[in-house]
Design a protein with these regions (language model features):
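… and, occasionally, acidic/histidine-rich disordered N-termini of signaling adaptors
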Residues: 6-183
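Cationic, amphipathic, low-complexity alpha-helical segments enriched
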Residues: 181-183, 187-191
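Juxtamembrane or sensor-core-proximal signal-transducing alpha helices
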Residues: 1-3
């Protein structure tokens, strides 16, 4: 019985070390500080509820001066959610960023082809350029746009399935004037 207890303790220590390694790997995928980008100011906060979570955000500056911003949340927690974040980031780094709708459609096809079972990725994606932004959503909560000239807050809710749900899903694209502040969020991220 004493031997079993020691084996259990060794196994638990190994599992905790693996979880810590997975957490460190995931955090290395996430920018710790917002980027500097002319004409924009960013603030962000992320707090995962477990060692490895599914929260994800990223920024992709383009050669033409546009900026893509993504905010996402994989279903569940733990290693599968962390793997989905890794796959999403890799898929985005391989993207051509034509527009948020087509980029999200292509990313969905990649995620569906990898097939992580029931794990999905909800994602908002925006392209900021020339005082406006194009926006699409794949199953995320709404974003909020504060219009400084009217002092109003508009909810931006675009229906869409989470990434990996259906191979041939497409994602609607809407265009907005960027007047002041936009808020993206998931359970663990405020951007």
């Amino acid at each position: 019985q004493r031997m079993q207890k020691q084996q259990s303790e060794v196994e638990e220590k190994r599992r905790m070390e693996e979880l810590e390694q997975a957490r460190e790997f995931q955090m290395s995928l996430i920018l710790q500080d917002p980027p500097s980008f002319k004409g924009f100011e960013f603030a962000l906060h992320m707090k995962t509820s477990t060692e490895v979570g599914g929260d994800y955000y990223d920024f992709f500056p383009q050669d033409d001066g546009a900026l893509y911003v993504v905010c996402g949340d994989a279903t569940g927690h733990g290693l599968n959610a962390g793997m989905m974040v890794s796959i999403t980031k890799a898929g985005l780094f391989g993207s051509d960023f034509n527009d948020p709708g087509s980029t999200t459609t292509r990313l969905n096809q990649t995620i569906k082809a990898i097939n992580l079972g029931t794990t999905r990725m909800s994602l908002n994606m925006a392209k900021f350029s020339n005082g406006s932004f194009d926006f699409t959503s794949a199953g995320m909560p709404p974003a909020y746009l504060y219009k400084s000239d009217k002092k109003t807050v508009d909810e931006i809710l675009i229906p869409g399935l989470p990434l990996g749900s259906m191979k041939n899903a497409t994602f609607d694209l809407e265009k907005f004037d960027l007047s002041s502040i936009i808020l993206f969020f998931s359970v663990g991220i405020i951007l």
